[in-house]
From Swiss-Prot:
Pathway connected to this protein: Amino-acid biosynthesis; L-tryptophan biosynthesis; L-tryptophan from chorismate: step 4/5
HAMAP family, A to Z: IGPS_B
Biological process terms in GO annotation: L-tryptophan biosynthetic process
Name the UniProt record assigns to this protein: Indole-3-glycerol phosphate synthase
Protein family: Belongs to the TrpC family.
PROSITE patterns with a match to the protein in the record: IGPS
Disulfide bonds: none
Catalyzed reactions: 1-(2-carboxyphenylamino)-1-deoxy-D-ribulose 5-phosphate + H(+) = (1S,2R)-1-C-(indol-3-yl)glycerol 3-phosphate + CO2 + H2O
Taxonomic source organism: Burkholderia multivorans (strain ATCC 17616 / 249)
Entries under NCBIfam families matching the protein: PRK00278.1-6 (NF001373), PRK00278.2-4 (NF001377)
Annotated GO MF terms: indole-3-glycerol-phosphate synthase activity; phosphoribosylanthranilate isomerase activity
EC number: 4.1.1.48
Recorded superkingdom: Bacteria
Length: 261
């Protein structure tokens, strides 16, 4: 792992330990059991069935590599705007220290619309998956660069037992081989290298030959223009996770519509 990823994972382990002391597992299970569920994978497939791109629209205030992306940041308004302009699902950053995210942002965004929501965070422990369910998330992210294969498989199984969808994220062919051992249909290819933070959409295009037909390829990071979208769709990649391009726009939902529809 890179220095930045090492640092993030170390912080996550500390956060999990603190959260477990604050909210015991049984209490969290009660919260999780009270939440309704929205079909994350089904929402993506419905867009595909209609011949449309499926956009997982991200709500992200900042990132370690780009700093603050959006000063005027009202998650509920952004969520409504995305829903009104054709998003299939939402992705909400809940990491506080590195991305200025919040659990509250996810709760506010989900309450503001009917779209399924991905908890975007660095998952290292099953406790975080139960947290995701308790806060209302419909899907979680597993990052191959941060997890070994047995742990990733264990975390996926636990997520599925809670009826959460799993998006597994990779950046290179070795990580893709690891991801293909999972059952989830959602394969995210991060065009940003978490070791160097360099970005190229070639990362997605160069791995398409590895992916079985029954999986859904989600291209992540570096999709900044209609030309990038057209390049991906020409390669039969029709599912996108986009944050920065929308967050930097005056009207995030309108930018989504301009780029994709």
């Amino acid at each position: 792992m890179s220095d930045i990823l090492d640092r993030i994972i170390a912080v996550k382990r500390e956060e999990v330990a603190a959260a477990m002391r604050s909210t015991p597992l049984e209490a969290l299970k009660l919260e999780a059991s009270a939440r309704d569920r929205r079909d994350f994978v089904g929402a993506l497939r419905a867009k595909h069935a209609a011949g449309q791109p499926a956009v997982i629209a991200e709500i992200k205030k900042a990132s370690p590599s780009k700093g603050v992306l959006r000063e005027h940041f009202v998650p509920a308004d952004i969520a409504r705007s995305y829903a009104a302009h054709g998003a299939a699902c939402l992705s909400v950053l809940t990491d506080e220290q590195f991305f200025q995210g919040s659990v509250r942002y996810l709760e506010e965004a989900r309450a503001a619309c009917d779209l399924p929501v991905l908890r975007k965070d660095f998952i290292v422990d099953a406790y975080q998956i139960l947290e995701a369910r308790a806060m209302g998330a419909d899907a979680i992210l597993l990052i191959a660069a941060a997890l070994d294969t047995p742990l990733m498989q264990e975390l996926e199984a636990y997520a599925h037992s809670l009826d959460l969808a799993v998006l597994v994220e990779v950046h290179d062919r070795n990580e893709m081989e690891q991801a293909l051992t999972l059952k989830t249909p959602l394969l995210g290819i991060n065009n940003r290298n978490l070791r160097t933070f360099e970005t190229s959409i070639r990362a997605t295009l160069d791995m398409l030959d590895m992916i079985p037909q029954d999986r859904i390829v989600v291209t992540e990071s570096g999709i900044l223009s209609r030309a990038d979208v057209d390049t991906m769709r020409a390669a039969n990649v029709n599912t996108f996770l986009v944050g920065e391009a929308f967050m930097r726009a005056d009207q995030p939902g309108e930018e989504l519509a301009r780029m994709f529809f």
